[in-house]
Amino acid sequence: AMGLDIRINGEFVPGAESWVNLSLLSVRESLNDVKHLRREIGAMESEEADKVPRPTDRLMNLSMFFQDYLPSNKNFKMHVNFSVGTGLPFGLKDNNEVYRNTYRFKPYHRVDLGFAYQLWDSTWKNKNPRHPMRFTEKAWLSLEVFNLMDVLNQASNTWVKTITNQQFAIPNYLSSRRINLRVKFDF
């Protein structure tokens, strides 16, 4: 296994953190006394492979997070989170050692969008000593849309066998678009 993980943190505007993360990974294996074969989907012939990818071999992952606020009201923030990565490997069912992890899922990609409004900050106590949230340090109300583009990212397969002993892979997908409303209190 080997990899490289690079992260750059910064602020496009003061007080609003942003970052870019790039990961390059390689996790390969070779089982003793097993001749590994690789075959592309739809191909009739196989080719020999010295090493095959392990189930966690995601070759590349790129994530970006950007945050901003309204210049006239720093209590209102917005953020965008973007992730893209190569697909994870998978193989045929039944712990197949010869054709081990020869295929890959489609690339993973997702965009999240969020808006947040600061309801209270303890530094405001002098201005508003009777505020209902004065017992907290900070209070935020946020609305987030996860998987904004409603992408169907495949997580795994459920294998179904027919009476003629053929196997079919039925995809299992990660969550679709979700809307999240949250109230956060810091004490």
Show where each model-derived region lies.
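Gram-negative outer-membrane beta-barrel transporters
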Residues: 1-92
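Residues that define the transmembrane beta-barrel architecture of outer-membrane proteins
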Residues: 2, 56-62, 107-111, 137, ...
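Outer-membrane beta-barrel architecture
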Residues: 5-8, 19, 65-67, 79, ...
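Short regulatory "switch" loops immediately downstream of catalytic or recognition motifs
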Residues: 27-39, 114-128
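C-terminal beta-signal and adjacent terminal beta-strands/loops
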Residues: 83-93, 117-187
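Outer-membrane beta-barrel transmembrane domain signature
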Residues: 103-112, 187
